[in-house]
Structure formats: C-alpha cells, structure tokens
Amino acid sequence: MKPHNSEKYFVKNGQPHFLISGEVHYFRINPKLWRNHLQLLKQTGADTVSTYIPWDWHEIEEDDFDFEGKTHPARNLIRFIKLCKEENLDLIVKPGPYILAEYENQGLPSWLLKKLSKNAFALDENGNVISPDLVSYLSDEFLEYTFKWYDKVMPIISKHQKEHYGPITMMQLCNEIGVFQWLSGKSDYNPKVINLYKEFIIQRYKTIEKLNSVYSTNYNSFDDLKAPSGKIKLRSDYCAYFDFHLFFREYYNKYISILKNKIRSFGINIKLTHNIPGWIYGNASELPMLISTYSEIMKNHPDIIFGLDHIPEFVSFRNAHSDLACNKILEAMQPEAPVWAAEFQAGTREHHVKAYAKDLETFYIASLAHGIKGFNYYMFSQGINPEGKGFYGKTFYFQTALDAASNKLALYDSIKKVNRFIRKEQKDLLRTNVNSEICVGFYKPYFFTELISSQLLKEKKLNVEELGLYIDPRFLREEILFNGLLRGLQTLNYNYDVVDLENCDLKSLTAYKQLWITSAEFMDAETQNLLSEFVLNGGNLILYPAVPTLDNYLNRCEILKNNFGIEFITKDSSHKVSAFGIEDVFTAFSKKQIYNDTNSKPIAFTQENEICGIRKKIGKGELTILGFAFGYTSDEHLELIDKLVKLNKIKRELFVSDKDIQFVVRENNKSRYIFFLNYHNERKTFNYRKSSELKKKKSEEISIAPFSYKVIKENK
C-alpha cells in the first residue's frame, strides 16, 4: 500500500484504496482470543489492524527481552504478527519509544526511568524534572537505550514487512511528539536543549548585531543570551519566545530524523507515519496549532504521512465543523499526501463520556464527505491492562466495536455498515473532489503559542496589552478563525480550501474567487507582499480584524498599509457595529481600526458612526477590510459571513429548504455524491435542488432521522 500523490489517496494492488484499519492491542487481550478479534475486524470490511508495541512490555528488565511469550503469552508478538498474515490483514506497528495509550509511564520501561540520570529528563527553567516519565528527546542516554530497543524490535518488523511477504505495511514513529509540552505549557530547558537552542540562534542570526537589531537589545555576544522563561514583559521577551517556538519545530525535526535514520538502517522500507493530537474537551481548535509544530518535519520528510487523531469524544452540532477544518489544514500543510486519521474515535477512553454508535456513524460518514482518505478505528477492540500497566485503571476503552472477550457491541454494526459503503464506492469516491471557490489563509506564526499558553493549567505568559497590542494570537486562531470563520462557512454550506501562506504561490491563490485572512497586528514582510500582489493581480481579499503594521518581531512593517494606500487609527468603541446594513453585530474587542480613505466604499460603522470597514478597488482586484473581530455566536455573524461571500457571486451548490441541514457535494467526471448531514436531535424533512436549477421542480421530500445522514449517488 502506498499513497498516490497526484490525487492524494492510498493505492493497493494498483487500485485506489481507502485505508480501513482497527486498533487491536494484543497485549491487552487474551491471546486465545486474538484470532477472534482479527476475524471479526476483517468481517467489517477492514483490511488492516494497528497496534502499539510497548517497550516496557517486551523489555521486562534491562537486556531481558521477550517477543515469543516465554514470560507471558500476551508477549508473543511474533505469533500475533503471523496471525495477521494468516487472516490476510495488513498491520500497522507503533513501537515507540513513546506510545502513551494510557499505559503506565507512557510505555517506557520502569527500570529505564529509574536508571536514567537527571540530565536525561526534560527539565524546567529551574532545573527540576518536569515529570518522572518525560525524558528529553535528544538526551544521549535516552537515545542510547532507544537504539538498544530498536536493535531488538526492528529486525522483527523488518523480517515481517510487506516486501518480505509479511503483513506489516506501515510504522508510526514515536507518538504525539510534543504533546506534554502543549498540555502543561512547560518547555524543556535540559542543558542539551539549551545548547542546541543557542546553536540555532547563532545559525539564524550569524552576528549578535543582527539579533540586537531585531530584538532591540544590546547583548555583547551570543554567550549573554539565555533561553526565554517566565512571563513576557518586553518586546525582546516576545522576540525570544518567537524564536524559541521556531527552534522547537526544528528540534522535533531533529528527533524524528534520528529515529527515522535508525529505522531505515534495518532495511525497513514501509511507509512511515506520525499522529497529531489536539482534540480536547470535545473541541479541536487546538489541533491546527499542533499541526504547525510538525511543520519542519513535514518539509524535510515527505516520506512521513501525518495522520490526525480525530477523537471528538461526543459529536454534536457544536463541534461538527472540527473534522473538516482539521482535514483542510493538514492538507494545506502536506499537500502531496492523503489525509487520514491515525486515531479515529471508536468508543471512549473515559467511562463518563458516552459515545453512541449512531452519533459516531454519522461522524464517520461526515468525515468521508469532508475528504478523509483512510482511518484507523481507535479502539476497535476493548482491552484489559496487564497487572500494573494501566495508567488510569484496569479497563482500556468503553463502547468499542468489540469488548475484550470479542463480543460484538452496538458500534460493530455501525462500523460494518460504513465500511461496506466505502468498499463498494471507494474507486469512485476516492477520485471525487469538492468545488471550492473560497480559500482561507493559514498563517503558522499565529499558532506559535504552545510555549506561552498552558492547555490544562490555563497559565498565560503573554498579555498582549503589555506590548501595546490588543489581538491575542491564540484567541484569533481559536475563536475568530477556527470556531468563527471556518464554523460559519460550514454552517452556511459554503465549501472552502485552506492554503499555507508561507508555502504557496500567486497562481494557486488567484484560482479562487476569494481569499480570507484573519490577521493580527503583525505579519512578516514576505507574506504582506504576497497578499498585496494577490490583490493587484486580480484577487479578492477579505482581511480582518486588523491590517498588520508590524512584522513577527513587532518591528514596523507597513507593506500592506502602504501598498493599499489606506489610513487608519485604532481606538476604543462600543462592542457592536453595523455592517452591510446588519445592525448590532457583536465584536470580540472594544478596539477597532477606524479608516479614513476617500477612495474606498464604507461598509461598516461603529455606534459612533465612524468607518470600521471598507471595500476598495486596487489594481485588478478588490480589497475588503473589516477593522473589528467577530467569531460565530449569533445569527448576525452568519449573516455577515454570508454577505461577504456573496460579494463575489459565490453560490452554494444546492438549495436546501431546511437551513439546519449541512451538505457536501463530491464529484468527478463520472459520479456525484451528495452527503446530507443532520447534526440535530430531531428529524429533518426537506427538499433540495441544484443552485443552477432553481426554477426546476424540487426533489422528492427527504427525511433524515435525528443525528443521522443520507448519501445520494448520481451517475453522470
């Protein structure tokens, strides 16, 4: 199995292939039932099984390895691999070193953690160990033991890979790199990390004079420079943290490179993958930030396909936009790879969270509509932790397709239904596309926040007002972009694509009727120039809530302002504005950009009747600027987005009589699939027509059960 880059899907035996896998943890299941679980998985239409290979489970004590079940029958990894082959199932293996998976010590051997010196662990700014199971990724000690583990497990994987007629087709490198840093907001200040950081800074700036000019500091030499810590008080602190974020993206790339080179040295030629976390408390607004942390890996390792951890916990209208948004952002970041879900929720990790089969089935179909090209049901089979190995307790996952004893649960039939649809339609469905006339810009520097904002502890090191700013980048990307614009476009049934603004060209941008940018007060010169050229060459740009006048280090950079010939001031006003005749539009900040431009058309006003939004012809294109921030909390916000979209005569593909119904049309030159999605807990009955055929007869009535779906296939 390999990815088909030109159309971004997997290929198996020369044919388009939708990757359907199920997570089955051999070490959490009675070995007598292994075959039952595999057979029942295959009977759903899946052709792949996925599992971690816990280092702790197989290296019981230092140099005491067991892969054949000599000390415990569930350690017989080789037998499990052979069973996969016998059942004609491909196998995805995840040998760590980290596995997480609610396994004690995240899968690292307890003997190892006791033996490692303090300098092998991630340390806080005071030199204290952050957590007893959190090592410093590039610690020489840790890598030495990791390689010893690889020396034992990789020959087994190599022997059983596909080219040697084994079942193994894919391997995951480590697991959710950087996730602890995101959750805790604590950086690794291990001495080796700090030395690498200083090397990074020297390579980036070359001379201390160059750094001083950017930071507005007066260091005598690079020896005076320290890694940033604590709260941001000065602009120089902000600059240092910005570079610290850049450094850690390179640091993760270095770690992955070391692991990959070691793995390839064993003659392992299968596809490699890594998983991206980010769903938390039923929302995925943080997942794009975590995608950004892997940007250097994606740039330097095109042979690693990144997969999303799509774990919504409970699916609802409130988070229904999240899978599409994350799919689109990942596609923008690795445009030559299929979008797939390395962990695709099947069941629930926490007993108090209920994940019902009907809801998940609708989520699975919605993900197909939203362009997913493969997924791994996580967990397909429930597990029972070996004694002392469960992080939270004995049972691992609830409401799965199979319980640990291989009994079918309610989700099994839903998975089988979805899989059968995929297998029947995959050759056509994988070759379909969605017609998108709207493009949304993804600007990675707005996502550099994991080191200054704790997800779990809710600690913030950045107060933008202390730097003379008013737009917090985290609020911008979460509430204005992700939960605002992207949710609004999907709710209104407008298709959109996402583009990486730092890795695109003018030609690709001008192919769209509109480009939307949610912007802070800062943006680098190159991107400001790109947006200027986009408009001058005929593009339609919608920019809000601010025209950037600073670069990413908060130095003056007014390229957009000057090239567009606009003048404005920033001042406080009421939280409500009027725009396009829509009254009482609630804005997130009291501060607004107030425009003074006689050559533009006013489109939005404060309650003091000052102009806070304009449209202006520039070159061959048109600029629309809103100097206020809005998300999606009211119907006025949806109406405003709708008005902006219609400025350039963009239409929905269908007219649907019930606006609560979301729909997606995927098509190629042979087939059209119409997905109708009811994210509401009430039955919906409606008619639909193509937007180009509004005068023609309406369709027959369609009725969809509460929180369900309907797929209609039309042959052209």
From Swiss-Prot:
Domain of life (superkingdom): Bacteria
One GO molecular-function entry: metal ion binding
Chain residues that bind sophorose: Y52, I99, A101, E102, N175, E176, G278, W279, E343, R349, Y378
One GO term of the biological process aspect: carbohydrate metabolic process
Principal subcellular localisation of the protein: cytoplasm
InterPro entries named among the record's database cross-references: Class_I_gatase-like, GLMA-like_second, Gly_Hdrlase_35_cat, Glycoside_Hdrlase_35, Glycoside_hydrolase_SF
UniProt keyword list: Cytoplasm, Glycosyltransferase, Transferase
Cellular compartment(s): Cytoplasm
Key word Cytoplasm present: yes
Gene Ontology CC: cytoplasm
Residues of the active site: E176, E343
pH-dependence annotation: Shows high activity at pH 5.0 to 8.0.
Temperature dependence: Optimum temperature is 55 degrees Celsius. Stable up to 60 degrees Celsius after incubation for 1 hour.
Chain sites annotated for binding beta-D-glucose 1: E176, G278, W279, R349
Record: residues binding beta-D-glucose 2: K358, E361, S708, Y709
E.C. number: 2.4.1.391
Catalyses which reaction(s): a D-glucoside + [(1->2)-beta-D-glucosyl](n) = a beta-D-glucosyl-(1->2)-D-glucoside + [(1->2)-beta-D-glucosyl](n-1)
Entry keyword annotation includes rRNA-binding: no
Family indicated by similarity: Belongs to the glycosyl hydrolase 35 family.
Job of this protein: Glycosyltransferase acting on beta-1,2-glucooligosaccharides. Catalyzes the transfer of a glucosyl residue from the non-reducing end of a 1,2-beta-D-glucan to a glucose residue of an acceptor molecule, forming a beta-1,2-glucosidic bond. The beta-1,2-linked glucose dimer sophorose is the preferred donor in vitro. Has a very broad specificity for the acceptor and can act on various aryl- and alkyl-glucosides. Does not show any hydrolytic activity.
Subunit structure: Homidimer.
Protein name: Beta-1,2-glucosyltransferase
